[in-house]
């Protein structure tokens, strides 16, 4: 075949050299997607922003790999599925990787090796790691156009560890050692905002407050007129975080672990639900309640919303005429938001973690008030 096949898009030149693609042999690469990622970097500048936040304590006269080139190579390798730094020993000679970083595929010097990349990843201190997170927050804040109200989801994901990695703790729920990375997502766009690698343990109140405080303050420099709402499960409904949010004008809706006091406050509602469920032909029946509650560790009362669901369960014990037992499942939510109990539970809290199905257009601002 001698006819040229036209490409559906133009590839940009590198160092004033025209870039063409063929399969005639020579030094080939299977990482063609890095050229598209290079264009994304040109548009958004994520790697450059990270490189500027990284400390560079090297002797300027002995530098062979610029900070941006090392960060770019590491990010591109991860994006192509090469998570381990040792993969760079092979990828440093890859022609397309070199092109994407800005070096000529044949005559250009190889990229940074595994040992150089490993030293790079161990350079940042905790303060400098926080500076990198702030750089990503700035990237997000300048990229996403905010509305009048924005919801941020905060949650953790368990990641099993195979070996003796630092901070890999035993987790009884998952029955293995690992990490519990903290993730923050922007609900309207589904964009990840922050990811924090941490030990597999329930976060303390001071830890939750610190994260929420720093993320909120950083985003407010870009979203000065936007109302921010934090949403998370009971791990994040800590008194330290709620008090800071209330004092700083930030809204929240968090899960709340049940206890005997809360159950007593909705006991009458639960009895009425059992009565109506017994007379109903439905397999499940729900109702909602809201009330003011103050736990012993709280310095002020707060609004609590309860969702009660009655259903028939085939467990042993007191049974109905059908051989099934009535059971009422109760879930609690603590919030600073106004609105009906049903709306806050179903339309706001229960949409947690489902970014694709959650939208908060302007006309819904009155509901989440």
Regions found by a protein language model. Give the residues of each.
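Dynamic "connector" segments at or just before major functional cores
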Residues: 1-203, 209-222
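Short, solvent-exposed helix-loop connector elements
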Residues: 54-63, 341-349, 365-369
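Flexible loop/turn segments at secondary-structure boundaries
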Residues: 97-98, 159-161, 191, 202, ...
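Structural preference for beta-strand elements that scaffold enzyme active sites
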Residues: 149-151, 227-229, 251-253
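Short secondary-structure boundary/capping segments
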Residues: 166-170, 244-250, 267-272
């Amino acid at each position: 075949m001698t006819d040229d096949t036209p490409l559906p898009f133009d590839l940009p030149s590198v160092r004033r050299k025209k870039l063409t693609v063929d399969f005639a042999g020579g030094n080939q690469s299977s990482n063609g997607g890095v050229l598209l990622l290079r264009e994304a970097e040109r548009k958004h500048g994520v790697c450059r922003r990270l490189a500027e936040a990284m400390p560079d304590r090297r002797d300027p006269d002995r530098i062979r790999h610029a900070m941006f080139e090392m960060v770019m190579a590491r990010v591109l390798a991860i994006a192509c599925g090469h998570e381990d730094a040792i993969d760079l020993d092979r990828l440093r000679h890859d022609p397309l990787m070199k092109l994407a970083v800005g070096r000529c595929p044949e005559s250009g010097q190889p990229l940074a090796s595994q040992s150089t990349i490993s030293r790079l990843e161990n350079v940042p201190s905790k303060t400098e790691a926080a500076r990198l997170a702030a750089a990503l927050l700035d990237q997000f804040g300048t990229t996403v156009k905010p509305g009048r109200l924005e919801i941020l989801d905060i949650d953790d994901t368990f990641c099993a560890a195979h070996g003796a990695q630092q901070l890999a703790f035993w987790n009884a729920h998952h029955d293995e050692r690992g990490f519990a990375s903290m993730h923050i997502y922007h609900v309207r766009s589904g964009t990840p905002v922050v990811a924090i690698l941490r030990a597999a343990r329930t976060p303390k109140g001071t830890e939750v407050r610190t994260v929420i405080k720093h993320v909120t303050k950083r985003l407010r420099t870009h979203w000065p007129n936007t109302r921010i709402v934090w949403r998370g499960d009971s791990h994040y409904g800590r008194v330290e975080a709620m008090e800071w949010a209330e004092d700083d004008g930030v809204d929240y809706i968090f899960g709340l672990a049940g206890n005997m006091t809360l159950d007593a406050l909705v006991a009458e509602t639960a009895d009425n639900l059992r009565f109506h469920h017994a007379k109903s032909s439905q397999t499940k029946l729900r109702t909602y309640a809201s009330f003011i509650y103050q736990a012993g560790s709280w310095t002020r009362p707060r609004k609590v919303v309860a969702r009660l669901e009655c259903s028939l369960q085939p467990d042993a014990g007191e049974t109905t005429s059908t051989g099934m037992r009535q059971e009422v499942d109760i879930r609690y939510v603590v919030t600073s938001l106004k609105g009906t109990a049903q709306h806050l539970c179903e339309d706001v809290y229960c949409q947690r973690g489902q970014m694709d199905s959650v939208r908060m257009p302007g006309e819904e601002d009155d509901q989440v008030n």
